[in-house]
């Protein structure tokens, strides 16, 4: 299940807490139910879980952190598995390198395997860019940078789910929550453009010349 906390007290101490970057963590995430397009994600509380609130896999850049995770599921059925997640230290999105592999084990003994690629199924949590199966649905300023989480959906076979397994590949992979449910269209948040300053246009030295308007329109010959 969950293997670390949203908050990190000390950067690079190899003890984890999100991506082990100190204050550049996800402690701003409020515990409780976060609804995304009607999809409920249960955000756990670090204070109540003993610091085991989310799943973070270190990848090559945090090789000392856990690289695999197993999340038991109590034989729940759902048409889709939804992840609320992000990645860190991603290769360029256009390369679509594999952030990790997602396995869904069913009660009947079968398994589904999904290759989760940055630039398609997940995105860099420090950037606002969304992709085909990585919809930007949450963002906040964590006193270091503006960070985001993305919702992704993976179509399941149909039998009850026994467990979800995750393995890191080319980048760190952070899963804040996951849920099973019916097919739902995920709506993302839009980028907001803000101006740092406002400017007043300089006064004109002289009025602009008036445009002479002709009463008869002229055809344009192409």
Language model: regions and residue ranges:
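N-terminal/edge-of-domain interface segments
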Residues: 1-222
């Amino acid at each position: 299940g969950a293997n670390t906390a949203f908050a990190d007290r000390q950067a690079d101490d190899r003890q984890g807490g999100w991506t082990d970057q100190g204050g550049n963590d996800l402690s701003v995430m409020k515990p409780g139910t976060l609804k995304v397009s009607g999809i409920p994600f249960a955000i756990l509380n670090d204070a109540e879980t003993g610091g085991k609130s989310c799943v973070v896999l270190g990848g090559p850049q945090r090789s000392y952190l856990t690289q695999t995770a197993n999340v038991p599921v109590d034989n729940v059925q759902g048409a889709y598995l939804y992840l609320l997640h992000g990645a860190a230290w991603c290769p360029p999105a256009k390369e679509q390198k594999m952030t990790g592999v997602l396995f869904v084990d069913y009660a009947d003994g079968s398994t589904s395997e999904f290759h989760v690629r940055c630039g398609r199924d997940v995105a860099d949590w420090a950037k606002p860019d969304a992709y085909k199966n990585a919809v930007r649905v949450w963002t906040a300023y964590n006193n270091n940078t503006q960070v985001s989480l993305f919702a992704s959906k993976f179509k399941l076979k149909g039998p009850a789910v026994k467990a979800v397994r995750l393995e890191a590949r080319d980048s760190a992979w952070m899963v804040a929550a996951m849920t099973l449910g019916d097919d739902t269209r995920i709506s993302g948040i839009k980028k907001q453009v803000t101006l740092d300053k406002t400017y007043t246009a300089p006064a004109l030295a002289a009025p602009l010349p008036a445009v002479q308007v002709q009463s008869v329109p002229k055809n344009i010959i192409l």
